[in-house]
Amino acid sequence: MELVHSATFPCKQKLLIAVTIATSLLTIIPLLYPLLEDPNFFLKQQPPSQSSIINLENGVVTSHDSCDIFSGEWVPNPEAPYYTNTTCWAIHEHQNCMKFGRPDTDFIKWKWKPYGCEDGLPVFDPVRFLEIVRGKTMAFVGDSVSRNHMQSLICLLSQVEYPMDASVKNDDYFKRWTYETYNFTIAAFWTPHLVKSKEPDQTQPKHIDIFDLYLDEADESWTADIGDFDFVIISSGHWHYRPSVYYENRTITGCHYCQLPNITDLTMFYGYRKAFRTAFKAILDSESFKGVMYLRSFAPSHFEGGLWNEGGDCLRKQPYRSNETQDETTMKLHKIQLEEFWRAEEEAKKKGKRLRLLDTTQAMWLRPDGHPSRYGHIPEANVTLYNDCVHWCLPGPIDNLNDFLLAMLKREEDKGFLAQVRKMLS
């Protein structure tokens, strides 16, 4: 089944012209001096940014977020999708729901509407995005859902340009692409636990399917390279459900569902908290990383009628209503992430590091209709396959994560302009 490309992006207003005026002011300040008595001089005729408001009062430039873009509900968007399953090569087969016969298309025709935001959350503008990241680098650090997110971004940007493969190693788990026109590089780093891990030895005839997780050692497969990137988006979640033995100081301290003698079951929540604490510490301790780190919060699965290996499925065709409760596990994982983020953020302020939160858990929890389910493979495939209620169809709800990402990048750009204005006026 092929989707119809149905919309183009509206032109976006330029960011605040206050900075331009401020620059001009420095060269003609004698002529404009009387105008400086007006505290709103830089804001006249200029609407607020969609993600922040800039004020100039008593000679002090300040900014505050105009609303919480992460609290809201899904509303119909008949203009979507903005790419199709036939126009984007970055879609992996198991996320190509249209190709494998998903009969409905309503699940791709929604957008996120934040509560109390006059301008809402604008749909993704690929040109605007590429202008912001011109000459910069961005890394997606995490598991296959992180890669799913990155592939969505590549598909959205394909309306403007296709990237060239710039990978430094022949490994599909560690890929890099460059948008040559914009000198923008995007990369994927595979690290499902964020910390150092050892997979079960599948070659043993009676292997035990248990991971070894070194909770106090960040995975060097990503920490060794983050200094090369301006933006790092980290996430992790579903792999922590798997049975694991926990190590700290290279000594076993407990496990999650390992069912091994003389080892205390500390639950997955213990390991999850420790893994994020270690990942944040690696960012904060890095002398080479000078960029912005974004935590993209947990994107929950939506199995109903059983677990992934017990016939569970996700067959809903509409989003949940905003007042429908999250499951207890998702709520607890989300709470742990926020607590560890806030803890790290306080330390980041002391060190001059920039940590930001993409708190998308509520939005993604409300989308049980967006997973591949049985439509991520050939229907008659003669192999044992499970319904996929973890990853997301492309196009699909995960595209909206990039609406959030662009909004956050705009905020960061606004903060940069504010710093320049303050410097000019000091």
Swiss-Prot record:
<keyword id="KW-1133">Transmembrane helix</keyword>
<feature type="short sequence motif" description="GDS motif">
    <location>
        <begin position="142"/>
        <end position="144"/>
    </location>
</feature>
<feature type="short sequence motif" description="DCXHWCLPGXXDXWN motif">
    <location>
        <begin position="388"/>
        <end position="402"/>
    </location>
</feature>
<keyword id="KW-0812">Transmembrane</keyword>
<dbReference type="InterPro" id="IPR029962">
    <property type="entry name" value="TBL"/>
</dbReference>
<keyword id="KW-0735">Signal-anchor</keyword>
<dbReference type="InterPro" id="IPR025846">
    <property type="entry name" value="TBL_N"/>
</dbReference>
<dbReference type="GO" id="GO:0016020">
    <property type="term" value="C:membrane"/>
</dbReference>
<dbReference type="GO" id="GO:0016413">
    <property type="term" value="F:O-acetyltransferase activity"/>
</dbReference>
<comment type="similarity">
    <text>Belongs to the PC-esterase family. TBL subfamily.</text>
</comment>
<dbReference type="Pfam" id="PF14416">
    <property type="entry name" value="PMR5N"/>
</dbReference>
<feature type="transmembrane region" description="Helical; Signal-anchor for type II membrane protein">
    <location>
        <begin position="15"/>
        <end position="35"/>
    </location>
</feature>
<comment type="function">
    <text>May act as a bridging protein that binds pectin and other cell wall polysaccharides. Probably involved in maintaining esterification of pectins. May be involved in the specific O-acetylation of cell wall polymers.</text>
</comment>
<dbReference type="Pfam" id="PF13839">
    <property type="entry name" value="PC-Esterase"/>
</dbReference>
<protein>
    <recommendedName>
        <fullName>Protein trichome birefringence-like 19</fullName>
    </recommendedName>
</protein>
<keyword id="KW-0472">Membrane</keyword>
<dbReference type="InterPro" id="IPR026057">
    <property type="entry name" value="TBL_C"/>
</dbReference>
